[in-house]
Amino acid sequence: MKKVLFLLLACAAVAFAAETNAPVEQEAINVWIKAFSVLAAGLGLGVAALGGAIGMGNTAAATIAGTARNPGLGPKLMTTMFIALAMIEAQVIYALVIALIALYANPFIVLQ
């Protein structure tokens, strides 16, 4: 597995180091970069939202179970749960920001 990963990274480095002088080729490359940016933004945000939803569900389930076992700790558990939910949601918002950057301010597109 390490050899395959090393080979993939080596090929990627060569591909990024290659320069092109033809504007037509660069425009075609920009189209592919835009297409894959849309795909990456959608998949990345979808996975982040799915992971966040699973994490929030587990957090709420654990808080409800803890409150059911010891009702006196309910307010403290709720406070901790809300802090945890904010941290989980922050990760999804970070993924959204990265997706928006990839869509609207893509640093990989070469302007002519």
Curated annotation (Swiss-Prot):
It comes from Campylobacter jejuni subsp. jejuni serotype O:6 (strain 81116 / NCTC 11828). Belongs to the ATPase C chain family. The keyword Transmembrane helix applies. It is found in: Cell inner membrane. This is ATP synthase subunit c. CDD domains: ATP-synt_Fo_c. Its main location: membrane. GO terms for cellular component: plasma membrane; proton-transporting ATP synthase complex; proton-transporting two-sector ATPase complex, proton-transporting domain.
